[in-house]
Curated annotation (Swiss-Prot):
It comes from the Bacteria. The keyword RNA-binding applies. It comes from Opitutus terrae (strain DSM 11246 / JCM 15787 / PB90-1). The gene is rpsC. GO terms for biological process: translation. Belongs to the universal ribosomal protein uS3 family. InterPro entries: KH_dom, KH_dom-like_a/b, KH_dom_type_2, KH_sf_prok-type, Ribosomal_S3_C_sf, Ribosomal_uS3_bac-typ, Ribosomal_uS3_C, Ribosomal_uS3_CS. GO terms for cellular component: cytosolic small ribosomal subunit. Keywords: Ribonucleoprotein, Ribosomal protein, RNA-binding, rRNA-binding. This is Small ribosomal subunit protein uS3. Binds the lower part of the 30S subunit head. Binds mRNA in the 70S ribosome, positioning it for translation. Part of the 30S ribosomal subunit. Forms a tight complex with proteins S10 and S14. It holds the Pfam family KH_2. The keyword Ribosomal protein applies. Disulfide bonds: none annotated.
Length: 210
């Protein structure tokens, strides 16, 4: 039986780059890896409203450069840059290192797989019908120039007693072709019936690779 691998990990060094880019000795590696995870968790928690699909981290000696991709840069930067300065201070206190923040705007959030998955999960939490939420996301992505999209919801859909899996697809989503630009996102909806997992695969055009 065929199993799906993570499209991001599958395409590393072919179509995708690592989200943490630094070198460390065997002794320091676990500590820095844990630090990266703490930075990401802190930022994702703080910037929940800013639509952040991914965060890149680079290191050089005692300096950490954090590149935040966001659909709403105004929320991250804040009035007169107040928010960004607060974030810098918090991360510097957390890591004990100099923090450099780089904010990159996501031009088309409707074709960012992580943001699409989070949006569908949010709608499920607001008790919107799962088929309607998926259909709307699929149509929006195709309208904005995606080559193809597939969205899958798993769990007690519609409050059913037995958990099941349903999906919708439009266009082409060739998961086995390494040269294709496949974006992948995952989110969870916390409903009164339990968790519902939302997965999203989007096949993008070359021009949409940001």
């Amino acid at each position: 039986m065929g199993q799906k691998t993570n499209p991001t990990g599958f395409r590393l060094a072919v179509r995708r780059n690592w989200q943490s880019r630094w070198y460390a000795t065997k002794k320091d590696f676990p500590k820095l890896l844990e630090e990266d995870q703490i930075i990401r968790e802190k930022l994702m928690e703080k910037l929940k409203q800013a639509s952040v699909p991914r965060i890149f981290i680079e290191r050089a000696s005692n300096r950490v450069r954090v590149k935040i991709y966001t659909a709403r840069p105004g929320i991250v930067i804040g009035r007169k840059g107040q928010e960004i300065e607060k974030i810098k201070e918090e991360l510097a206190k957390l890591t004990g290192k100099e923090i450099l923040l780089d904010i990159q705007e996501v031009k088309k959030p409707e074709i960012e797989a992580q943001l699409v998955a989070e949006n569908v999960a949010l709608q499920l939490e607001r008790r919107i019908a799962f088929r309607r939420a998926m259909k709307k996301a699929v149509e929006m992505a195709m309208t904005l120039g995606a080559e193809g999209i597939r969205i899958q919801c798993s769990g007690r859909l519609g409050g059913a007693d037995i958990a099941r899996r349903e999906w919708q697809r439009k266009g082409r989503v060739p998961l086995h072709t390494l040269r294709e630009n496949i974006d992948y996102g995952f989110s969870e909806a916390h409903t009164v019936y339990g968790k519902i997992g939302v997965k999203c695969w989007i096949c993008k055009k070359e021009s949409d690779n940001n």
